[in-house]
Amino acid sequence: MPEGHSVHRLANAFQAQFAGRQVDASSPQGRFAAGAALLDGRVLQAAEAHGKQMFMGFSGDVWLRVHLGLYGMWRFLGSGLEGIGRRSRKPADAADFPPHPGDAVRLRLVSGSHVADLSGPTACEVLSFEEKAMFMIRLGEDPLRRDADPERAYAKLHASRMALGLLLMRQDIVAGIGNNIYRAEVLFRARLEPHRPGRALEADTWHALWTDLAALLADGVRTGRIVTTEPRHRRRQSGPALRDDASYVAHRAGEPCRVCGNAVLAEPMGGRTLYWCACCQTT
């Protein structure tokens, strides 16, 4: 499932390449025919992400909400979209543009030489401005958004007896952390024991964690990668991090901790695998 940084990259791509343009919308699969008809011919005015949700605003105060979930993906074709989502195959003959979408495409958006195909999303729906606003109220704080309020997130964390490792996965508290990478890594970097109850978390520790998380997510938006290690803890300390050096504990069960050398632990938590170091994470 894509983390928040990936959805922000998608929103940025739509904002840069589609905003201000009239869009032809269709549903080759047929499952979103009514929704596509509502969008067809409108101008895409804005694209924004909030956690794992992407909202695209069209002329007439009509909004499209997309949540990719586990299997959803966007495929793109057009200049300026390299490295964002997956690329559709460009037809050899210009007369064949846009290329045939295939039967699995829930929604196709075409504007000039740009094509975006959506397939397999968990959610894809058209909302009014009021419905979009009501939906966003239910979402937690997204560290990548300017309107994020870490104090509001802390109030929810500090009122709970649940473990931090569970609370950080809740999208109504912190929007955008959803798999076992950012959760595991930000807790490790803060040296926090993942079973520690939220009510035991001090405010200054939370603010340091929030700042670190925001920086890691911003790096992910910029590079398209999740890299949480410092150069001094990598085998190659100059240049981009190798794939095997990108994380401290995530997906490294049984391997030596990069800081203390003890084995990284793995256990189920919140329906996902939690990775952590019992030696380093004692706070």
Task: Map each language-model feature to its residues.
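Structured catalytic/nucleic-acid-binding cores of DNA maintenance enzymes
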Residues: 1-283
